[in-house]
């Protein structure tokens, strides 16, 4: 899994799935319904990610943290962190062997946005999307 920078304010879901699928951001965006609109407006939900991955034959399932419990988060898992002062809309990150792939590690700077790896999640996990 390689670094993929999100190319729009709400494009973290696209960047994480692109990295997981070894596709470019633009290639992956085509697998999201209304991706070019949602990346600029309200972003994506778990079902959008699951459907996009399904479109490229990757099976996934979403869990809330209450249901997930203390289970270990495996490589290739996408996590949504809850809204916070820093991430006012929440944020998706991808678990990799290099740590958490953050598609906008230099938030809030958008010009240019940069992706990077970090050792810990920058917030509290709210949702987990696991590859089946």
State each model region's role:
Residues 1-38:
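Active-site-adjacent structural segments surrounding the nucleophilic cysteine of cysteine proteases
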Residues 32-124, 130-131:
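Conserved active-site-adjacent core of cysteine acyl-enzyme catalytic domains
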């Amino acid at each position: 899994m390689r670094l993929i920078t999100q190319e729009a304010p709400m494009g973290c879901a696209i960047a994480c799935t692109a990295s997981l699928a070894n596709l470019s951001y633009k290639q992956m965006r085509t697998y999201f319904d209304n991706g070019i609109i949602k990346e600029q407006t309200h972003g994506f939900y778990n079902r959008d990610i699951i459907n996009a991955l399904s479109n490229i034959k990757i099976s996934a399932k979403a869990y809330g943290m209450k249901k997930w419990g203390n289970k270990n988060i495996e490589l290739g898992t996408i996590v949504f962190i809850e809204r916070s002062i820093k991430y006012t809309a929440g944020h998706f990150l991808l678990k990799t062997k290099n740590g958490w792939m953050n598609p906008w590690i230099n938030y809030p700077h958008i010009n240019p946005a940069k992706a990077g790896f970090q050792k810990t999640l920058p917030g509290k996990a709210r949702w987990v999307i696991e590859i089946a």
